[in-house]
Amino acid sequence: MRGKEFWIILAVVLILSAIIIPIPALLLDLLLTLSITFSLTVLLLTFFIKNPLEFSSFPSVLLLGTLLRLSLNIAAARRILLHGHEGTHAAGKVIEAFGKLVAGGDVVVGLIVFLIFIVINFIVITKGAERISEVAARFTLDALPGKQMSIDADLNAGLITEEEAKRRRQELEKEANFYAAMDGASKFIRGDAIAALIILFLSLVGGLLIGIGIRGMDLASAVKTYTILSIGEGLASQVPALLLSTAAGVLTTKMSSRENLGEAISEELTKQPRALLFSAGVLGFIGLIPGLPTLPFLAMSAILAGAYYLVQQSLKERELKELEKLAQEKTKEKEEEGEELIPQPEPITLEIGYALIPLVDESQGGQIPKKIKNLRKQIAKEYGVIVPLIHIRDNLRLKPNEYRILIKGIEIDRYELMPGHYLAVNLGNAKGPIEGIETYDPAFKIKAYWITEDKKEEAQKLGYMVVDAETVLITHLSEVIKRNLHELLTRNEVMELIEMLSKKYPKVVKEIVPEQVPISIIHRVLQNLLREGIPVNDLLTILETLADYIEQTKDPDLLTEYVRQALSKRITRMYLTNGTLYAIALSPKVEAKLVKFLKENREDEFIDYVLNTLLPKIKNEIVKFAQYGAVPVLLTSGEVRRFVRKTIEPYLSELAVLSYNELEKQVNIKIIGIVDED
């Protein structure tokens, strides 16, 4: 158990002990003083904090303070009833002093003053603090969903990071818990005020009965003694109660700001100094009315007039400082003219026309931000990389229903939606035409039609894939991101991935990175894999493979081939159709010719041969994959794979080029075409 926890538990035990065990008058004085000190400290603390959540333990503090006062009430009542006949000092000096001070030698006056004090505490302060707590709790809880949606919207729009969103959600949860707890804690104060009245009555009546009936005191002496003691006891407990009630009210009415309460009130009251001047004039006029006391009103009028003068001087000084600051800023701007920093482009940006704003505005029912959040999670899970925040903004230069997707500030693609319509996409198995506006699917560039909702069921029956406008945008965005993951992967993100892996395999990562394999090579290899759509989830295998071959070569492209072989099972299964790998292959003659070009460093001839001789034949063979419903795959030897892929990528990006070395041994391969030069 930690020291702080021990002292809290010990304090609670001692407070509860005071209820049962009789305590001497001196110790009671010390404890009553402690109660007042504790309450005063809490009150002053609420004045200096700037945010109520800085004192989130206040409800618990309030409970402990109430428990302390009640235990002292019981202890004091016990001493009054047992030792009251000994005199007003029987319950200690603190209670005696409070009782005599208020009573002023007249017990009736003392009782009336005490009751007034109780009324002020119970009806004004306590009742007000309780109501404030109830309203604050209700409005805080009512606003909770809206605040959560606002955080999600800021996150989806890229205005805040994941860490900032998490921190805000935690603060929101803490705020809701705080005000809910304050609503309940305010009941402690109210009950404490009621208990004070009951204890006063019991102490007074019980004391009189014991003093007169048992101790043999005369009526006048008993009334005076027990009234002073009862009033003193009540005040000694109600003064700290009043302080804590005020603290509760101050805390629940405090708004979050950069200033403490004193600074906030001072600044706001002095914003309009004319109010001080008018008040001074009114008080001066009242002071001159015959029959009214002149000195107090004129004195207060003079004080307010002086305050007005001082505030005016302060405002003038503040304005001068602001003007000087503005002048300095302008000078600095002139000095830095022509040296402005060029802002870095956002990794991913979605720009929309004004008519598409409802699709991205969650307050209007737009689902795009939520779907984008899910999309980032899905891609991260599928490919093992961190997808950057996607920034959404409107662009008045676009058509009303148009959007465009930018990667690092460069436009990758754009498309025009038809909100309220559905996109019917012909995947090749549609049984007939459908009435609609002819267009294409932006993600896969397949022929499609915009149809109205009443045609949706008909299109589905004909074999069309039917999706709404939001899904079209999200699918398009998804494909653009997947095709550009290699560009989005930065070295910083690679280091983050390695750091996450090190939490699970610290020794392996420490041994490999960066002692054996530098970050730059890991970055290039991961980019190469992502460029061809290979997930990098299995980062451990990738690092271990790089460590095995780094002594043989430092070429990232060649190292990528070794990594692909290590990931053979994963790569093979990406392209299986019903357990079979359908592929076209290069003929032995073509393979031999390509290898010869590479060995003789005849790269220009290699490229010319692939583009002019092989590419047309590859395109002719690719059409065969449709009848099998398979992903197009070209098989080559390991020596030429990466060079063939690099050459044909701009023309056939959807064609996967695999080498025999990176295929799973037990895989069932079906060659459906041979690429030959004849």
Curated annotation (Swiss-Prot):
Keywords: Bacterial flagellum biogenesis, Bacterial flagellum protein export, Cell membrane, Membrane, Protein transport, Transmembrane, Transmembrane helix, Transport. Coiled coil: none annotated. It is found in: Cell membrane. InterPro entries: FHIPEP_1 (IPR042194), FHIPEP_3 (IPR042193), FHIPEP_4 (IPR042196), FHIPEP_CS (IPR025505), FlhA (IPR006301), T3SS_FHIPEP (IPR001712). The chain crosses the membrane at residues 8-28, 29-49, 57-77, 105-125, 194-214, 231-251, 275-295, 340-360. Required for formation of the rod structure of the flagellar apparatus. Together with FliI and FliH, may constitute the export apparatus of flagellin. This is Flagellar biosynthesis protein FlhA. It is a multi-pass membrane protein. It comes from the Bacteria. PANTHER family: FLAGELLAR BIOSYNTHESIS PROTEIN FLHA-RELATED, FLAGELLAR EXPORT PROTEIN, MEMBRANE FLHA SUBUNIT-RELATED. GO terms for cellular component: plasma membrane. GO terms for biological process: bacterial-type flagellum assembly; protein secretion. It comes from Aquifex aeolicus (strain VF5). The gene is flhA. Belongs to the FHIPEP (flagella/HR/invasion proteins export pore) family. Pfam families: FHIPEP. Its main location: membrane.
